[in-house]
């Protein structure tokens, strides 16, 4: 495997070169160590952690989560179909195994368990993704790679993405009592237009912040080079004068799974962030926050399996979808600072959050013109609501000694959650949908549940020796998560019998740990080490989802254990006037992965674990029984390098700089029988090279990027958990590719900034691995033809596209 190690060798070479160019760094007034602020004199890089501040978000023209991680090869975005993305992939795990928090508040869990996807996900009737957030609301994003439940709680198996919202203090002060920022622009890949306003003010101890953003666009374009492929049965080609009928001339053309173009879509997003605060004095402050964000996506699902015929006789429907992602949050916060006392700073916070993930579906018959006013449309609605109420108390204390500093961060918190769903369907008159043509069928597709959690933590940073030569971190956290299925008066006795432990709590509790060591062994070089753990409590659908059906009987399993992870890292870092670099190696071990497991055929013996009663009380015999169970383990290991070199250190023009960011990772899953198998969620190695120039006047700058990504070899994939001996069939379309991007900015005076970027300049056609592994082999959505792979080009990434923004600040 010579190719994957080329970027690593280059990384090592640059690492050796940096110390030669290093010089004294500028003094730093404060140092952040695991989010504990301590006095220091130099800047330390942390293993597995990157902070992206507002200035960088603007520079990178970040408009969504794909832009956020575009040039970070150690993290990728999980594709979630027409409704958007579904979280992130870090170090071989994805979705709910990577924590996502906004101001410390966990975001919605997905409906991504194997059981849910087998039963419902393949048909597109649910918006089962994790919610996303508006980039203009954030002052900083921290990406943590590697298990990190000490800081991020449940879900941080592979890492975490932590967003921090803007505050009035980011813009106003005693010297500047007001701020007004206006921003607008366009995004070429999805014909997006957006506008945003940020206003902040301060008066008599009162301060306020308002961020309002509106976006609208269309479907994300692809780079298909072919027309829509025709798949014909028995060698026949459709002839409109022939009366053979659709069964003889089944043909997929512009619609159906062989469609090569993305489905037509229009979407709109509106987001509001409002903060209000009052400073009683320099030591006491109270604040209030309100967030409201809604995204509506309207899709004409032409690639749906049932929209696949173009013969004269209608055999399918036109399917239209409206997917809604809605989030509302309100909270109150109190801050206190003491010169002498049990804490230097105290923060008390209470938040309430509501997240709705909804899908409306309309099936319109193809022959509606023949039916006229009597035509009917089938309508279904699937609604998932997740409510959260959370309180936290965070404390910080620093003690200074003659040759040491001890900084402690400790606190506790808790909360409760409520998962509810509403599902119904009916027929209505096509030309007047208010007139129902059938009864409204209300059903419960998912078992509703309640949850509670509480936690306490203690995190310490020790600075030892003169000049902060040694730094040691050590922390511990305790979590207890519990959930219970809600009882419903409408449940029959038989249904109650299908839900184990109905109404009683099932709890998961344990400790998370984190330690770190930083040895500054020369003026500019640091040796870094880190150990951390993570856990993920089972999601609601992993625990309580059941499906009593003779062909596929799914049993709920409230006895699941939490998934666990342990992470080790060792690194070398350097910084100076010539730039900075960080080279690290890591290994992570996972265990108790939750997977859908075939238990065998059913039994009518109530004491048998395969006992399978139906809703009417009938016990099934010889039906296949499945259940979510803790089964496999896994390990991943790899190497990462990122660095920036200021080229004026070797005599080139001031402001010229270059950079390299590389990630290489490999790993295996270990099955119950000890066999090791590939992990589909591992991304192929990627290297990002950059070359840029920032004028010393700071009026303008330009940056060029080259991204090289290797192919995902079929031998590094598995077909499914039921077929571990064969590769993922669409992996053969994964090829190595190189992308070239260019971005620039121009400051006009002190108030106005223009930014522009061109992506995929060479108009390269390529598939990302995340896109290929999102294709389904069964169901009705995200499909291609299983035999010929016709329609595969629908999953190509965008070709050449352009972004533009203009921003004015006053």
From Swiss-Prot:
Which compartment or compartments is the protein found in?
Cell outer membrane
* Gene Ontology MF terms: siderophore uptake transmembrane transporter activity
Q: Which PROSITE patterns does this one have?
A: TONB_DEPENDENT_REC_2 (PS01156), TONB_DEPENDENT_REC_3 (PS52016)
Transmembrane regions: none
Q: Which UniProt keywords apply?
A: Cell outer membrane, Membrane, Receptor, Signal, TonB box, Transmembrane, Transmembrane beta strand, Transport
Which Gene3D superfamilies does the UniProt entry name for this protein?
A: TonB-dependent receptor, beta-barrel domain, TonB-dependent receptor, plug domain
Q: Which residues form the TBDR beta-barrel domain?
A: 175-810
Q: Which residues form the TBDR plug domain?
A: 34-166
The keyword Transmembrane belongs to this UniProt entry's keyword annotation: yes
Keyword Repeat among UniProt keywords: no
The membrane topology term of the UniProt record is: Multi-pass membrane protein
Signal peptide (UniProt feature, chain positions): 1-22
Per the record, its GO cellular-component terms are: cell outer membrane
The residue numbers the entry assigns to motif TonB C-terminal box are: 793-810
| A Pfam family hit | Plug
Q: Which family does it belong to?
A: Belongs to the TonB-dependent receptor family.
Give the PANTHER family listed for this entry. HEMOGLOBIN AND HEMOGLOBIN-HAPTOGLOBIN-BINDING PROTEIN 1-RELATED (PTHR30069:SF29), TONB-DEPENDENT OUTER MEMBRANE RECEPTOR (PTHR30069)
| Name listed for the protein in its UniProt record | Hemoglobin-haptoglobin utilization protein B
Q: In which organism is this protein found?
A: Neisseria meningitidis serogroup A / serotype 4A (strain DSM 15465 / Z2491)
